[in-house]
Structure formats: structure tokens, C-alpha cells
Amino acid sequence: SDHGYHLGEHDLWQKVSIHEESAKVPLIICVPGKKPAVCHSLAELIDLYPTVSKLCGLKIPGNIQGKDISGMLDDPAVKVRDAALSSGKGRLLRTEKWALLDYGKKGELYDMENDPKQYDNLFEKSEYADTLARLKAKLKAKLVEIGKNDLNLNKL
């Protein structure tokens, strides 16, 4: 599936943000012999390669960044990731509870359990400073992890 589409939410139109309406992508996997289920675990599109490889009985290379999410097909409660990253006009770090939208020096922070429509920006509220610092550190670690791969793009 493609990304979502804004229809005026957050004063935005079309696909121009990293808010939930635009960044969340439905994923449907149909595997012969597996019962239908709905999973709510976080995943990234980069997880499709190792997942399809595993389902086809192929060896998954150890140096890829995606994670095999096929375990969710047997147990919908399986959690593969504690956070997922999206990027566009900024970066989104999404955990089950939090959404950090990072635009460099500015940003947005939302409690997705209590504010799933992302209306109450907590980014500059002092009582969320520890949560914000923890999520920023997690985002930085994720970006470092992404940068450490065997792809030498300078040779392309």
C-alpha cells in the first residue's frame, strides 16, 4: 500500500507530512495455510524483504537492516520492533505509546494512547522533557544503526 493522504488534518492536504494519517501504511500479508489475523506490532517497509525471504524458505542475509516479521502470522501478539522510523519532511520515531516528529531544532511529541489524532503537541511542555530526551536518543541511535551497513554508496 501507499502512504496515507491528508484531507485537512493538521491543516495539511495530500501526502506532505510524517503525521500518523500520512506515515501509517497498512500491510496485508496472505500466506497459504495461515489463518487471518490482525497484528498491531510496529514494522517498517524494510522488513518485507527478510519476511518474504523467510516465507519462501530462502536464507536471510545477516547484514540486512530489516527484521523478519513472519512470527506475527502465527502469533499476532508478537512484537518485532519497539520503534519504527519514517522520514519525509522530517523524521518520525513511532513507538506504541509515543510519536516523535523531528524537524531538526523543532518538533512535535504526541502521546498516541491518549491523543491518537495528534492534536496536543507535548514537545515544549517541561513535564515531558525526560520522555523527549529518551525518544531523541532512541532516534539518534536508530539513525546511527541505519548508517552502519555494508552498502558503500560512494562507489555507486
Where are these regions (language model features)?
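Active-site-proximal N-terminal segment of extracellular/periplasmic enzymes that hydrolyze or transfer
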Residues: 120-128
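Short acidic, glycine/proline-rich loop/turn micro-motifs
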Residues: 10-12, 121-122
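C-terminal cap/loop subdomain of S1 sulfatases and analogous C-terminal strand-loop tails that border
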Residues: 3-9, 30, 35, 44-113, ...
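A small-molecule sensor/coupling module
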Residues: 138
